[in-house]
């Protein structure tokens, strides 16, 4: 089984905030001794951190649930509960994080040490010392801790490489990478010897350096899933320059120009933006018989597809095995990289709106009202539900406070407008109570 994994589905859950405490101190002439209950500690957040030492998402094959710890409860003497530590989850460079429900991109992690809060820990509930007022100097009110965020995520790794080698199987991509870098890809005289991407650092004689990726061979229909399909096409997306390697000896019995057209069609079908990347045509195996004649025919067919004044793609005849023509190829690649900016990987439409994602959207509705088949009024909404779960329903004062909050939000008035009558059942989550008009 391959130890390379570039996709994963996981769930993350931040820690719940600790509950606030109801407590009183003993003090003469102070009702109930005065409030003394402290706040709960914050729940731990789930944070993704980039580790450049990781190369795959293999760690997520069997470990798919990540849960941060909850904060401690508030204590007497007004002391706060201890906040929980954040849970750090390490991911490789080039990891894209998507919301599994919407498919939107939450973040794209590309820099070593980069950190992003993926699920925010809940805040601690306030203790009764926070609710003391001149009218109520000894409140029996404390909040429950806020639940931590919970999310279903899709992770996708797209390796970071400046240059990507593409081409049919057995055209010499792995050999080229092994010759120009210290990478040691598997090389064999059969198709799909390379079944995972290989990455190597290339340094030219003039001192320029860049990362080069050897990607598994493509065949016609790859964008529809034939062969290794689109499994590794995603890794081309981060490259700025594509080296299109072609077996100019036609040792497999295919026409080199037809190979060139087929691979470009697959790239275009998979992602139209891949064709925006500049290409250098690498005419490999030029030390083989008939390679020179095939190259002449290739150039003629290629020129026929361009207007007289168009710039044709650069073509570099090489032999990876014989180490011929490599210096010129690498220097030209470095020069092309120097004048090629990074390509936008995601449009704004692909990205999660941060304000909406973290619950700060101005358009967020406080509540919604629906009616079940059993005639029960059902209240829902992120803000309302957050207030509800933080209310200690075991204490009368907390319940009365929650009722005042509902009135302040306009829930009572909205229920009346919808036709609610005195005594009608109303439900929030699993909690049910009667409407009082």
UniProtKB/Swiss-Prot annotation:
InterPro entries: G_OBG (IPR031167), GTP-bd (IPR006073), GTP-bd_Obg/CgtA (IPR014100), GTP-bd_prot_GTP1/OBG_C_sf (IPR036346), GTP1-OBG_CS (IPR006074), GTP1_OBG_dom (IPR006169), GTP1_OBG_dom_sf (IPR036726), OBG_GTPase (IPR045086)
Chief location category: cytoplasm
Residues given in the record as Mg(2+) binding sites: 174, 194
Protein residues bound to GTP: 167-174, 192-196, 214-217, 284-287, 319-321
Gene Ontology BP, a term: ribosome biogenesis
A molecular function GO annotation: GTP binding
EC top class, as a word: hydrolase
Keyword GTP-binding appears in the UniProt entry: yes
Enzyme Commission designation: 3.6.5.-
Cofactor section: Mg(2+)
Any one annotated GO CC term: cytoplasm
Keyword Phosphoprotein attached: no
Domain OBG-type G span(s) in chain numbering: 161-338
Subcellular location per the Swiss-Prot or TrEMBL entry: Cytoplasm
Obg domain sequence ranges: 2-160
Gene3D superfamilies, sorted: GTP-binding protein OBG, C-terminal domain (3.30.300.350), GTP1/OBG domain (2.70.210.12), P-loop containing nucleotide triphosphate hydrolases (3.40.50.300)
Pfam families noted in UniProt: DUF1967, GTP1_OBG, MMR_HSR1
Ranges where the OCT domain occurs: 359-437
Keyword terms, alphabetized: Cytoplasm, GTP-binding, Hydrolase, Magnesium, Metal-binding, Nucleotide-binding
Record's function text: An essential GTPase which binds GTP, GDP and possibly (p)ppGpp with moderate affinity, with high nucleotide exchange rates and a fairly low GTP hydrolysis rate. Plays a role in control of the cell cycle, stress response, ribosome biogenesis and in those bacteria that undergo differentiation, in morphogenesis control.
Oligomer and partners: Monomer.
Family, similarity comment: Belongs to the TRAFAC class OBG-HflX-like GTPase superfamily. OBG GTPase family.
Protein name in the entry: GTPase Obg
Gene for this chain: obg
């Amino acid at each position: 089984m391959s130890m390379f994994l570039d996709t994963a589905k996981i769930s993350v859950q931040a820690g719940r905030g600790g509950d606030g405490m109801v407590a009183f101190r003993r003090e003469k002439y102070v009702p109930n001794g005065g409030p003394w209950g402290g706040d709960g500690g914050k729940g731990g957040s789930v944070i993704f951190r980039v580790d450049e030492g990781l190369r795959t998402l293999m760690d997520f094959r069997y470990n798919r649930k990540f849960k941060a710890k909850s904060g401690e409860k508030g204590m007497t003497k007004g002391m706060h509960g201890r906040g929980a530590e954040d849970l750090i989850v390490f991911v490789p460079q080039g990891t894209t994080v998507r919301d599994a429900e919407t498919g939107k991109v939450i973040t794209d992690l590309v820099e070593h040490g980069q950190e992003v809060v993926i699920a925010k820990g809940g805040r601690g509930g306030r203790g009764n010392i926070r609710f003391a007022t001149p009218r109520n100097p000894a409140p029996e009110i404390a909040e429950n801790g806020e639940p931590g965020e919970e999310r279903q995520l899709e992770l996708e790794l797209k390796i970071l490489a400046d240059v990507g080698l593409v081409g049919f199987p057995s055209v010499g991509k792995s050999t080229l990478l092994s010759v120009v870098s210290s990478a040691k890809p598997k090389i064999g005289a059969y198709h799909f010897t390379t079944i995972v991407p290989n990455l190597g650092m290339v340094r030219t004689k003039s001192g320029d350096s860049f990362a080069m990726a050897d990607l598994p061979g493509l065949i016609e229909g790859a964008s529809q899933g034939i062969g290794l399909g689109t499994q590794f096409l995603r890794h081309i997306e981060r490259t700025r320059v594509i080296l299109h390697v072609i077996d100019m000896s036609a040792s497999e019995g295919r026409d080199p120009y037809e190979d060139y057209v087929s691979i470009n069609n697959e790239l275009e079908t998979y992602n139209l933006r891949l064709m925006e990347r500049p290409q250098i045509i690498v005419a490999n195996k030029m030390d083989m018989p008939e390679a020179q004649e095939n190259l002449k025919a290739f150039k003629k067919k290629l020129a026929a597809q361009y207007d007289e004044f168009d710039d044709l793609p650069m073509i570099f005849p090489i032999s990876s095995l014989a180490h011929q023509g490599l210096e010129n190829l690498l220097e030209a690649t470095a020069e092309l990289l120097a004048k090629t900016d990074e390509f936008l990987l995601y449009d704004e439409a692909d990205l999660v709106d941060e304000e909406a994602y973290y619950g700060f959207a101005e358009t967020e509705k406080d509540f919604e009202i629906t009616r079940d088949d059993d005639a029960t009024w059902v209240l829902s909404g992120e803000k309302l539900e957050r207030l509800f779960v933080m209310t200690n329903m075991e204490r009368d004062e907390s319940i009365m406070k929650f009722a005042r909050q509902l009135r302040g939000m306009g829930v009572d008035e909205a229920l009346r407008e919808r036709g609610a009558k005195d005594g009608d059942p109303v439900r929030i989550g699993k909690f049910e109570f009667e409407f009082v008009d």
